[in-house]
Amino acid sequence: MSHSSEQEIIARLSHAPCGKTVVNHLSENCAHSMLNACRWCAMCGKESKAQLDTLELYSGVELCFQTYLSSQFTHRHDAPASTVMEINHCRAGRIGWRMKDGLSLYLGEGDVSLHSMSRCTQSEIEFPLHCYEGLFFSVDLDALDANPPELMREAGVTARGVYERFCQENSAVLSACPQNASIFDGLYTIDRTILLPYARLKFQELMLVLSRTPAPVSAPTPYKADQIAVVRQIHEELLSDLGQRRTIEELSKRYLMNPSTLKDVFKFVYGQPIAAHMKEHRLERAALLLRTTDDSLSEIAAQVGYESQSKFSSAFKSVYGVLPREYRKQTFRLKSE
């Protein structure tokens, strides 16, 4: 996740109260919102922040933008009276659900998921990167198919048909691709004065595309909850002391997990191999130390796990585009202006 995306999320939630979920209804029919009808609620930590912006597109179709600063939420709602499909898109960060059937599902930037709303009546939502921005469409199959919008009607596309293709037995995940981006990205940036007609067009485009998209060959990998819990413990240990480098073999012996399974589950949860993920954290911490301390480059290199200052400088430049010394100069220059 880019530093700029994280800062945008922090800024957007700067006025949101801690420990609360703020729900804004962007359309007049908020009393008929599916979130209200299903008595949706989320319980979060005292330091967490969340904002949901909902918009009714058609009878039976709602769009909800969601922004979180949190590591975990407990989320529950009543089972809907009819079949409701939820289509999620991740714009920034990473999100994971532990559904009531034990299945864990994770999305990274650009990914799309589809599942029945009855699967997540009570679920734990995790944000491995501690912040998240995305959206989801809630689609009541019967209500939409009873009065479909023009483009879907002309193309012979039904909500029930899309549901049966992707959600009949399991949840489905469609990996990030240019087609996903072309449908979803504009929804986050379009002028709010034309959001409703634009979102209606994009929803119809999405349904037409999904009606012609093959369902994934395999369902999301059903890793066990205890395996994910162990990997989260490992992640916390790795972050607790960035100056130490621990091998996969060492971790697998200590936590009694097969090395291959450890690597697979870690990537499933955090979206990256262990080495790449930890490199990001090491260099983010290094950038913070360069901005906020007078520590020497060799001291900072050691604090983030680099024995060689030259290797540290090379790794830093590969991510930030400049050497650490120049990065520090640029930071001080901006502060003095």
Task: Enumerate the language-model features and the residues they cover.
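N-terminal low-complexity or simple alpha-helical regulatory segments
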Residues: 1-82
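Short hydrophobic/aromatic patch on the recognition helix
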Residues: 262, 266, 311-312, 316
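Conserved hydrophobic/aromatic pocket- or pore-lining residues that grip, position, or stack substrates
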Residues: 199, 238, 262
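Glycine- and acidic-residue-biased ligand/ion/polar-headgroup-sensing regions
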Residues: 71, 81-102, 111, 141
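Terminal helix-turn-helix DNA-binding modules in bacterial transcription factors
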Residues: 232-240, 245, 249-250, 268-310, ...
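Alpha-helical bundle regulatory/interaction domains
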Residues: 98, 103-232, 248, 253-259, ...
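Ligand-binding loop in jelly-roll beta-barrel domains
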Residues: 48, 57-61, 77-84, 118-136
